[in-house]
Curated annotation (Swiss-Prot):
It comes from the Bacteria. GO terms for molecular function: ATP binding; homoserine kinase activity. It comes from Nautilia profundicola (strain ATCC BAA-1463 / DSM 18972 / AmH). It is an enzyme of class 2 (transferase). It is found in: Cytoplasm. InterPro entries: GHMP_kinase_C_dom, GHMP_kinase_C_sf, GHMP_kinase_N_dom, GHMP_knse_ATP-bd_CS, Homoserine_kinase, Ribosomal_Su5_D2-typ_SF, Ribsml_uS5_D2-typ_fold_subgr. Pathway: Amino-acid biosynthesis; L-threonine biosynthesis; L-threonine from L-aspartate: step 4/5. One of its GO terms (biological process) is threonine biosynthetic process. This is Homoserine kinase. Keywords: Amino-acid biosynthesis, ATP-binding, Cytoplasm, Kinase, Nucleotide-binding, Threonine biosynthesis, Transferase. Pfam families: GHMP_kinases_C (PF08544), GHMP_kinases_N (PF00288). Signal peptide: none annotated.
């Protein structure tokens, strides 16, 4: 069995812990029953991951597989990772969604993706990454009484993501610690109206309006101070035609939405200005986690 799962970009500026979308940058995991458990890791951060005593995917997979079957079988796991760690591209959510899905598939127990999303809450209490990782597309998600409610919209093929991946990380915990304890009403209203406009733009496919309505007063500015070059990234991307330019999750990656024809000029200028950063043009993923048997 082979399972693939996409990277995700969450928050999208003002949509804190609520908005997210899936990118066509995928981790792939091959799982085969075996006489003994073995793990092979290739791709992004492979050398670091090989040094860890515990494998997060394997632990989650085995827990759910045992719960579903009552068995403690052995498996060969082969990872080919393309999602970088700790860069705000949903690497943890990708692991969680893929592991739970793989357990159900290997146990041959029927499931729906909303079941996978809600099980994932045990490991990731914020639904903005886990939902698009499971479903693909642009997702709006709300957590209420330990249940995720969500809506999904397919992202048109004429759009691209230009992602800027810095050469250093921003710790998610440190990013959350940088948040204020209290916010004034004006800032809260700004975020509500901006997040609402982003949602309406994606569902109506009227993306031009994004150039004028994306504004965050809750988290971005403080988090971006950890990688101050990101302020220049945003300035250049918007100048070169990006529809919106926001921190991806808690960072350090910066997400830029653009029309396909504008993406290449944005990419070229950013690449010339930030030679130590990794710049990628990515299509969007409308499928989410996917299994090949």
């Amino acid at each position: 069995m082979v399972i693939t799962v996409p990277a995700t970009s969450a928050n999208l500026g003002p949509g804190f812990d609520t908005l997210g979308l899936a990118l066509n940058l995928r981790n792939e995991i091959e799982i085969v029953k075996s006489d003994y458990t073995s793990i092979e890791i290739y791709g992004e951060n492979a050398e670091y991951l090989r040094t860890l005593k515990r494998n997060y995917f394997v632990e989650i997979f085995m827990d759910h597989y045992k719960n579903l079957t009552g068995k403690e079988d052995s498996f060969k796991f082969k990872f080919n990772n393309k999602i970088p760690l700790s860069r705000g591209l949903g690497s943890s959510s990708a692991v969680i969604i893929a592991a739970i899905t793989a357990a159900y598939e290997m146990a041959q127990v029927p499931y729906k993706k909303d079941r996978i999303i809600n099980l994932a809450l045990s490991y990731e209490p914020h639904p903005d990454n886990i939902t698009p990782a499971a479903l693909g597309g642009f997702c709006v998600a709300k957590l209420r009484k330990n249940r995720v409610y969500f809506l999904k919209k397919f992202i048109p093929t004429y759009l691209r993501a230009v992602v800027v991946i810095p050469n250093r990380t921003i710790s998610t915990q440190k990013s959350r610690n940088a948040l204020k304890a209290h916010y004034n009403l004006k800032d809260i209203v700004t975020n509500i109206s901006s997040a609402s406009m982003i949602t309406a733009a994606f569902f109506s496919e009227k993306f031009e309006i994004l150039r004028n309505v994306v504004e965050d007063k809750i988290h971005q500015e403080n988090r971006m101070k950890a990688v101050p070059e990101l302020f220049k990234v945003r300035e250049i991307a918007l100048r070169e035609g990006a529809l919106m330019s926001t921190l991806s999750g808690s960072g350090s990656t910066f997400f830029n939405l653009a029309y396909k024809d504008d993406a290449y000029s944005i990419y070229n200028v950013l690449r010339d200005n930030f030679k130590d950063f990794t710049i990628k043009i990515l299509q969007f993923d409308n499928v989410g986690v996917k299994v090949y048997n």
